Amino acid sequence: METTPKKKNSLKHVLFGSLIGTTIEFFDFYIYANAAVLVFPQLFFPGSNSTIATLESLATFSIAFLSRPLGSAFFGHYGDKIGRKFTLVAALLTMGISTVTIGFLPSYASIGVAAPLLLMLCRFGQGVGLGGEWGGAVLLAIENAPPNKRAWYGMFPQLGAPIGLLLSGGTFLFLTDSMSNEDFMDYGWRIPFIASSLLVVIGFYIRTKITETPSFENSKKEQEEVNVPFLTLVKSYKNQLIFGTFAAVTTFLVFYLMTVFTLSWATSDLGIVKRDGLLIQLFSVLFFAIFIPVSAVVADKIGRRKMLIIATVAIAIFGFFFSYFLSSGNIVLVTTFACIGMALMGFTYGPLGTFLSELFPTNVRYSGASLTFNMAGILGAAFAPMIAIWLASTYSVSYVGLYLTIAACISLFAFLVISKEEHRF
């Protein structure tokens, strides 16, 4: 009786279980991001000029960020009440079904205005699923971690972001290289959405093999049960919610400026062909992946808060260089820009999950960490690509950099107000 849980909660099982789910979730999320720039403006929003169509497409992209806090509240409630395992499986299925459905949607030419409406509904479902996935995956890792390695364990689910992005970008690159533009726009773009069902099956199988974390089991035995975790958060952990949210804003903004905005601006305004734009993105993501574990190691040595403050200051400075890198179609400058931005993203993203989770006790941690992370997504990412494109088109790309610098200053203030990690384990 005692050996089975220990076997299932081995280091390999825990870390791979936390990584595979976020990889699948972010793959699903990013294939939508690529399609929102490369495909959806023509298929779901015809009749407008290219800039307006792109903005309309990116508006559907933002819907997921608005629905993610709903997923956080819903799945967080059950994750704190009945356990991490069941909730992680349910969140994965919600995201997966929504993504696969997009692959079967007819275009505007076939069913008219119903097409973008159905697209928005599926995007809403993606957001709900991801809102419940991230927090649970992080907790699966850090609630099984020794105290001196929480950032290291917590970075494994964070690695799902660059891996998912590499898979999605690589898939789109392969498809655009292997078929004509007409075939790609006709049916090729659907392949990644439908094929994601295979990844969901793998993730579902692995998640069903995971047992509850020791922290959750101890919490059920030793603490009073919280009837409504969300209400407890608002009543007793309001400061952690507010300042944790603002602390994470810059992480979201820098990422979506480096991916969605940079890909859109480079291919539509700087004259870089789509294939080269995708190659730049894929290459820069390697820096994202490399610096996630680097930042986790540093964070375990000097503290999560201190590591995040250093990264945020660097991002604020980086904002002043947008004009230098993005004022021309020089592919070397654009690539350098993307690589620096993604490296900074790795520095801030690696320890973030651990930092946010340590702000809350076990019985509301799923809800608390998920809500702070996903509310930051609304503020930092929901409308970021649209705002950035508008700023760059109306004024110049230097204003996009200023946008990032201002956000970084807000996050820096939040980190300074949060005086120390609370380690509520």
For every predicted segment, state its role.
Residues 33, 238-287, 381:
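Extracytoplasmic gate region of multi-pass secondary transporters
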Residues 36-68:
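Extracellular/periplasmic helix-loop-helix junction of adjacent transmembrane segments
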Residues 72-84, 292-304:
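Helix-to-loop junctions at the C-terminal end of transmembrane segments
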Residues 81-93, 301-312:
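Cytoplasmic membrane-interface "Motif A"-like loop-to-helix N-cap segments
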Residues 93-111, 314-328:
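C-terminal ends and interior cores of transmembrane alpha-helices
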Residues 152-176, 373-384:
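Glycine-rich segments within core transmembrane alpha-helices of 12-TM secondary carriers
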Residues 203-210, 407-425:
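Multi-pass alpha-helical transporter architecture, strongest
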Residues 306-351:
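C-terminal transmembrane helical hairpin of 12-TM major facilitator-type secondary transporters
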